Amino acid sequence: MFCFQCEQTAGCSGCTGKAGVCGKTADTAGLQDELTGALIGLARACANNERKETTDRIIIEGLFTTVTNVAFDDDSIKEMIDKVNTEKSKIVPGCAACASRCGNTDNYDMKRMWEADEDIRSLKSLILFGIRGMAAYAYHAMVLGYKDQEVNNFFYKALFTLAEDWGMEELLPVVMEVGKVNLSCMALLDKANTETFGTPPPVTVPLKVEKGPFIVVTGHDLYDLKLLLQQTEGKGINIYTHGE
C-alpha cells in the first residue's frame, strides 16, 4: 500500500506495507484507490455526455468514502465502486461494447499518479485530498437539502485533471481553484447548518461523564446527531461527541 493522506502518516512520508498508522489495511487502501480511479472514469465519461440526476450525489458520496477514517469496511467500498461503475455505464452505455475502444472513459489506474514525478504527484495530491475534504462538506450540506452547482461542477473538473498528463503550469491554477471553491463549499455548509439548526451561540460545555449507558460519536454530521438524540430521548442514554 501507499498512503500519505493524513498528518499521522509514517515517517512524514507515507504509509506502506500491510497497514497504515490509522489501522487501514493494504487491501482497503487498494480499494480506495480503485474507487478513486472509478470516480475519475465517471468524471471523464461526463466530460462530453449529459449527467444523470443521480450522478452528482454518487460523485460526492464516492469521494467522501475515501476520506481518512470514514470507511474502512471493504464490502462497503466495493459496493460504492459498483455504484460508480453502474452510473458510468448509464451515461456511456456503448463504451463497454465498443469494438474500437478510445479509452477516454476508462477508469484511472492510481499507480500512474503515485509513481509520477514528485512535483506532479504532489500537486495532484493537493487536488485529490482537497476535493475529498470538500466532498465531506458538500455531503453534509446535501443531506440537509442544500447544494451549490458551482461546487458540484468542480468535482468533475478536478477529477478529470488527475488523469491528464499536465505539467506544473497547468496544475497550479487548479490547485488554487480547489481553495477558492472549497471556501464556497464551506459557506454552503454553514448556510445549511445555520438555516436548519440555528446560529450556535457560545455555551459552557459540561465535561462530567454521567453514569449509565452512553454512545460516543466522532465526526461533524449534525443531522445524524439530531436523529440520534431524538431516538434516545427519555431512554437514559447519554451522547458524547467532540467538535471538528
Task: Show which residues each predicted segment covers.
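Metallocofactor- and cofactor-centric catalytic cores in central/energy metabolism, strongly enriched
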Residues: 1-244
